[in-house]
A protein has these predicted regions:
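Acidic, low-complexity cytosolic segments
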Residues: 2-26, 35, 39-145
Length: 145
């Protein structure tokens, strides 16, 4: 990824998440790195909650890669595109967002509700339109001199 390209780890992308929370039923949104760090969060979520959610969502994607072996998914094609947590009266949607990132969205509605369908569509639209900007650069190891 070129250094000139705006990325989620160098630019504030909270405006994207705040826009998602304007959809009916959407409570919170968190953009996270593949290693579980918060890159951006909606104004509706407390930082501590965002950090726990980012770590958990990252773990879900890791679990998804591991269990993909069950489907004989080849290496490189084993990263989930989305993970859905279906709770009574709530739903958590976690989407692969860009290079090294995911986007978690909490919706106050049942999985089969119109609110979840709209939230899912809005999230997919944001990801498809902004994937390069929702990406994060590879972390580099720093050696002390």
């Amino acid at each position: 990824m070129p250094d000139q390209q705006p990325a989620a780890d160098t630019h504030d992308m909270s405006w994207v998440l705040n826009r998602l929370t304007q959809e009916k039923g959407v409570l919170n949104a968190v953009l996270l790195s593949s290693d579980g760090m918060v890159l951006a969060q909606s104004d509706t979520v407390h930082r501590d909650t965002a950090e726990r959610a980012a770590a958990s969502a990252s773990s879900l994607f890791g679990l998804g890669r591991s269990i993909a072996e069950l489907a004989d998914a080849p290496e490189g094609q084993n990263t989930p595109r989305r993970v859905i947590i279906d709770l009574p009266e709530h739903c958590i949607l976690v989407f692969s967002a860009g290079h090294n990132t995911a986007l978690a969205v909490a919706v106050a509605a049942e999985m089969t509700s119109p609110e979840v369908a709209v939230a899912s569509g809005a999230t997919i639209k944001a990801v498809n339109g902004l994937a390069p900007a929702l990406s994060a650069r590879e972390r580099t190891a720093y050696r002390s001199a």
